[in-house]
Amino acid sequence: MARVCAITGRKARSGNSRSHAMNATKRKWGANLQKVRVRIDGKVQRVYVSARALKSGKIERV
C-alpha cells in the first residue's frame, strides 16, 4: 500500500531545502496521512487517508 490518500490522492511532494548560502538539496514534504479503518463498498478496510479529508467529512471512520 503506497503512502497516498485513498480519497483525495494526496501524496508526498518534492522540492529543495535551501541553506543560508542558498545551496539546494532535494527533500520531500509528506502529506499528513493517517491509517484509519473505513467502510468502502460495504467492507471495512484499513487505508491511508489525509487529515484534510477526515476533517472535511469526505470519509467517516468505522
Swiss-Prot record:
The keyword Ribosomal protein applies. InterPro entries: Bacterial_rp_bL28, Ribosomal_bL28, Ribosomal_bL28/bL31-like_sf, Ribosomal_bL28_bact-type, Ribosomal_bL28_sf. It comes from the Bacteria. The keyword Ribonucleoprotein applies. It holds the Pfam family Ribosomal_L28. One of its GO terms (cellular component) is ribosome. Keywords: Ribonucleoprotein, Ribosomal protein. One of its GO terms (biological process) is translation. GO terms for molecular function: structural constituent of ribosome. Residues 1-28 are annotated as: Disordered. Disulfide bonds: none annotated. Belongs to the bacterial ribosomal protein bL28 family. PANTHER family: 50S RIBOSOMAL PROTEIN L28, LARGE RIBOSOMAL SUBUNIT PROTEIN BL28A. HAMAP family: Ribosomal_bL28. This is Large ribosomal subunit protein bL28. It comes from Bacillus cereus (strain ATCC 14579 / DSM 31 / CCUG 7414 / JCM 2152 / NBRC 15305 / NCIMB 9373 / NCTC 2599 / NRRL B-3711). The gene is rpmB.
